[in-house]
Amino acid sequence: MLSVLDTFTGFTGLLNERWKRDLSDLIYYYKQERFHIVRLNSLVYYLGDMAWIPPIRIPQDYAQLTAQEMADLMERILREGNYTTLVLDIGDYGRDTLPLLEKCQVVYAPIREDPFSAEKMREFEEYLETTGNNAVAEKIQKIHVPMVTGGRRMEHFPQELLWGDMGDFVRSLLKGQRNLWDN
């Protein structure tokens, strides 16, 4: 399962799809205390065997939930959706990601080998140490993510994403790991 939390993912064009519902709808139901499994299932789309929720279209919708509320929502998705693994891109929460990261058993941090990226990671690790979040720091696994090229024919992009280098990479990370979200 995949919940993509990214401001502008490009998936609409790459997948040639305009979704009627997305993560914004789920956030709305959650805030109205109307979240339940039927609503969740009405928002889930499938790409092969991967269940996913289309990302927010309007970035301001991220402000509707605190990071703690988003962590609670993700827990409900796992519990009520009967999922064992949840993959998140939490970049839009910035330093407010701690409530989300504290819930995770593993935090994969994509890194690059340039000085700017190395300094950003160093600052984040320093922040974790300064704020006493050593438990989160211990969960971080730095990874080098393969480039998604999309191939020559964009109509095959979904299959290439799942079964190409990126899909192989993610499957190898998750192989044998279940219940990656702490209870």
Predicted regions located by residue number:
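Phosphate-binding loop that captures ATP/GTP phosphates
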Residues: 1-52
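Charged, low-complexity, helix/coiled-coil-prone segments
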Residues: 10-25, 62-73, 110, 165-166
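NTP-binding/hydrolysis catalytic cores, primarily Walker-type P-loop NTPases
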Residues: 156-183
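Phosphate-binding/switch loop-helix module in NTP-utilizing enzymes
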Residues: 40-47, 52-98
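Residue-level recognition of beta-strand->loop/alpha-helix junctions
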Residues: 3, 54, 144-146
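Conserved nucleotide-binding/hydrolysis micro-motifs of P-loop NTPases
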Residues: 6-8, 57-60, 115, 149
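Generic detector of well-ordered alpha-helical segments enriched in charged/polar residues
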Residues: 24-27, 41-42, 71, 75, ...
